[in-house]
Amino acid sequence: MAIERTFSIIKPDAVAKNHIGAIYNRFETAGLKIIASKMVHLSQEQAEGFYAEHSERPFFGALVAFMTSGPIMVQTLEGENAVLAHREILGATNPAEAAEGTIRADFAESIDENAAHGSDSVASAEREVAYFFSTEELCPRTR
């Protein structure tokens, strides 16, 4: 098994509903370790930069507006096959299709406000972690 890092966002809808602790509990219960975490309120420029790959998609404006509508939690998670493990915990992008017991099934309202984001690959995780965290901010567990 490979120890990986992945990037995670708890989106404005879930932060506003005080689900941060419950979501962190899901990560830790699944064996993922939080090695960096902070709350940020994205500027339009930050949101547009983070989601630049979607800039030509019709939903881009609404996505940026949503992601700047309130604070978010960003975190780096570490564990065995962390990218896949985290995505399984999140559930399907559309909460109506998410398996029972997943974060999106339990905490999301709609496909547009779906509670959380997770990297889709190790390469994406590396890019996304670097967007929000310096190397010095990452604190691998030593015990």
From Swiss-Prot:
Would the keyword Ribosomal protein be found if you checked this record's keyword annotation?
Answer: no
Matching SMART domains: NDK (SM00562)
> Which top EC class is named for this enzyme in its record?
transferase
Q: Per the UniProt record, which EC number(s) apply here?
A: 2.7.4.6
- Entry's family note: Belongs to the NDK family.
Name the UniProt record assigns to this protein: Nucleoside diphosphate kinase
Q: Which UniProt keywords apply?
A: ATP-binding, Cytoplasm, Kinase, Magnesium, Metal-binding, Nucleotide metabolism, Nucleotide-binding, Phosphoprotein, Transferase
Q: Which gene encodes it?
A: ndk
Q: Name one GO molecular function term.
A: nucleoside diphosphate kinase activity
Report the function annotation for this chain.
Major role in the synthesis of nucleoside triphosphates other than ATP. The ATP gamma phosphate is transferred to the NDP beta phosphate via a ping-pong mechanism, using a phosphorylated active-site intermediate.
